[in-house]
Design a protein with these regions (language model features):
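Outer-membrane beta-barrel channel domains
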Residues: 1-217, 248-256, 281, 292-295
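Exposed, low-structure sequence patches enriched in small/polar residues
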Residues: 47, 132-383
Length: 383
């Protein structure tokens, strides 16, 4: 699965909300990091020759128009176009978005159309959804794909929130020329419940408690059942400024159709993961956190990890974060491309991070970040 990165370039972040149609977390037909991303010919960063964005309204319609062109767009650069139209009303919203991408080096064009809705039939109910179609034109042939997401939300009060959704992506749906989709070939239902407790007496050490519970049942479009997932997260905020969080996750036995990189299905047993984290209140110029986790990431082995964090506030507008996360696992399961088989490794790794955040003036921020990772792994078993 491709890694998703957020965009930091002001032109692609300011006044960009009109193009936001992401109903499934982080997924959208317009992903600005594509523009100026790795070139099709050599993988180096593409240079942007020009870009323009127009945002406005005409009567009841809000609109956004976008176009960008990379250098050498006639040969290796790419051209991007997007149009978004939204009709908002008090109890409902309808929107459409169309993107078009030209990639001459690959002799490829991609047209994506999306339609989304947001309807509030009552005070406690909400219906949201999106339908997508992709049309890809290449020298080797044309393809089209469909996708849909529909959800119903129930919010009886400000403490409870429930959601049930259905998702279906064809195995030919492809929006990633200009958008971001974690994967296609997926049919999934999702159920979540959120509850917040805030009515603690004033003399209680607890300020609030939150609970998040999620369950998913995925399969691919061939009907192969993938691993079901159940997660529960609890968080407790104390009046002193400290907080405690607990996470429990279970991935139930099923198939993984991605880990082998297209070489077949892999059946995995139940996997369980959990973690507990505690953060102290700020005392003087320091705040600390500690955590422990138990993991299963392979076929049958267990592992564990620790986390230690320290934040230093030398003065109000500057803070420095230090964190260290050692982890050891007896069963790190990965696909070995050259050997076309799975390998189980005994792994030890340490992740470290140092971050400095400085706010010299209003609307000004300077951030420096250093991160490193060390891994020592020994092969145990091949499959």
């Amino acid at each position: 699965i491709e890694v998703l990165f957020s965009d930091k370039r002001p032109f692609f972040t300011e006044n960009q909300s009109i193009f936001d149609d992401a109903l499934v977390k982080n997924e959208s037909v317009f992903y600005t990091r594509r523009i100026g991303g790795p070139r099709d010919d050599n993988g180096a960063a593409g240079d942007i020759e020009a870009a323009v964005k127009v945002i406005g309204s005409a009567g009841p319609v809000n609109y956004g128009l976008f176009a960008a062109r990379e250098d050498d767009a006639d040969e290796v650069g790419r051209s991007y176009y997007a149009g978004r139209f939204v009709i908002p009303r008090g109890k409902w919203l309808l929107g459409t978005q169309t993107t078009y991408t030209e990639r001459p080096f690959r002799n490829r064009t991609a047209l994506v159309n999306a339609f989304n809705y947001d309807i509030k039939p009552g005070e406690v109910w909400r219906l949201v959804g999106q339908f997508m179609r992709s049309d890809i034109d290449t020298d080797s042939g044309d393809s089209s794909g469909l996708g849909s997401f529909n959800a119903i939300q129930y919010l009886p009060n400000d403490r409870w929130q429930f959601e049930f959704s259905l998702l279906h992506y064809d195995d030919t749906l492809d929006v990633n020329d200009m958008g971001y989709l974690r994967r296609n070939d997926l049919a999934e239902w999702y159920l979540s419940a959120v509850h917040d407790w805030t009515d603690f007496p004033e003399d209680s050490r607890t300020a609030s408690v939150s609970m998040r519970a999620f369950a998913t049942r995925p399969s691919n479009t061939d009907g192969v059942r993938l691993m079901d997932n159940i997660s529960v997260m609890l968080g407790q905020n104390m009046r002193s400024g400290s907080d405690i969080s607990l996470r429990i996750n279970a991935s139930l036995a099923g198939y993984d159709d991605l880990i082998s990189r297209g070489h077949g299905l892999v059946y995995l047993k139940n996997r369980f993961n959990g973690g507990l984290t505690y953060s102290t209140p700020k005392r003087g110029a320091w705040r600390k956190s500690v955590g422990v986790e138990v993991i299963q990431e392979g076929y049958e082995g267990w592992g564990m990890g620790l986390q230690a964090g320290l934040t230093w506030y030398p003065y109000e507008k500057l803070n420095l974060d230090f964190s260290l996360q050692p982890r050891q696992s007896r069963d790190w399961l990965i696909w070995i491309v050259d050997e076309e088989r799975l390998g189980s490794y005994s792994r030890r790794n340490i992740t470290g991070r140092v971050t400095a955040n400085w706010f010299p003036a209003e609307r000004h921020e300077v951030r420096l970040n250093a991160q490193w990772l060390t891994i020592d792994a020994e092969g145990r078993q091949g499959y």
